[in-house]
Amino acid sequence: MATRRQPLIPGWLIPGVSAATLVVAVALAAFLALWWNAPQGDWSAVWQDSYLWHVVRFSFWQAFLSALLSVVPAIFLARALYRRRFPGRLALLRLCVMTLILPVLVAVFGILSVYGRQGWLASLCQSLGLEWTFSPYGLQGILLAHVFFNLPMASRLLLQALENIPGEQRQLAAQLGMRGWHFFRFVEWPWLRRQIPPVAALIFMLCFASFATVLSLGGGPQATTIELAIYQALSYDYDPARAAMLALIQMVCCLGLVLLSQRLSKAIAPGTTLLQGWRDPDDRLHSRICDTVLIVLALLLLLPPLLAVIVDGVNRQLPEVLAQPVLWQALWTSLRIALAAGVLCVVLTMMLLWSSRELRARQKMLAGQALEMSGMLILAMPGIVLATGFFLLLNNTIGLPQSADGIVIFTNALMAIPYALKVLENPMRDITARYSMLCQSLGIEGWSRLKVVELRALKRPLAQALAFACVLSIGDFGVVALFGNDDFRTLPFYLYQQIGSYRSQDGAVTALILLLLCFLLFTVIEKLPGRNVKTD
């Protein structure tokens, strides 16, 4: 009797293996392109290059300071946000999340409008007869921008750790008379210290790979990071060998940081509590004053740059800028790239999670983790490094394309996969635990299960992942910086051209449009499932 031939790869494994192979192949192709173009021969001259080591040291130094200045204040701000309830608190917490996806050049424009030599604070000091000496360029400007982006995110993540503390622990501490330092040390710190290392590692990695911020606010050779040196080597000096060498160094550093971040990241289980929302009745005056001051300072950090973008964008150049076809061409380019990259990102992420879910269900935990880790691998290759690999690969083979839509879409989709994984990973596991036995008993599998179960139950997480991926793509500048030209420009690239040509009023209008587009796109996509969507 003939036996049925077994497939070489099970059908449920094909999606994840295909997506993982694609991601790894792209990373490997970019790496080989960099390696082949790196200078051959004696590497001793590389290690003796004083400017190279200055760039590497500055990259680490600014990332360390940025992480320190973001995490330490975030500890106290998170405690203040946990203890206080005030009008607009939910809006502030949402703003803390939105800073993560805010286009870098929009924030930079707002920071320059507030802290620049012709900015709001300079005008205020001049009216008071004082001299404004702060310059938003150089190391201090880079740190200011990084704190603007990362302090809110760190506060939000640490607030989650505080919310996981069981109410019984807080009540017992109050009954024992624990206040101030002792309460922080014995109750809050054990929960915070598990979250602080992974948060600090994440911020360090993001700041180490920062490109648009340093490009806009670096202010000269003394404030140059590895990514900016790569851009200069390709765009100004056209030295592919040096760019490849710098990209390899950047990739090795980022790979080490990714592995460190993964090692430090530990899931914190929520505390079991019957006293949800319990608050200490002994709410002292000085505690309320300190918390209020911290929250007001956080608002003064976040709101002025955003308000500056809105206020400066509504100027007399507004009708003229809106009438320019170039603006709408850039907007359409940004929109189509963002939507295509977002959809591709979510599809690849679901492919990885689908096969990973099946591997875990078959008790193959290590294989499932390896499949998910392939999606995180792209963090070791920042956008500018990946784009450099594509640039060298195409330049040495078929030549650079006239329109780089496909390259930018593909690169942005890959760069957003880690964020989409974080959004979809836990909901996917929850659905597996809830419906797996039922699907097996009913014989629902494959495409039928995806259509009947996953796509219905994951409507909200899928919309959120798509929104994050689209907005991250629409605000990206690192990849477009290498491939952008007068025939292919996105809104961030167009804004950078306006800033570089000192058309500040035109740039203000573009920054406002980009800001509104990001918030509108994020809100519309996130609301697509509807308020009363049923996930059962």
Regions found by a protein language model. Give the residues of each.
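Short helix-to-coil transition segments within interhelical loops
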Residues: E163-L192, L359, M437-L458
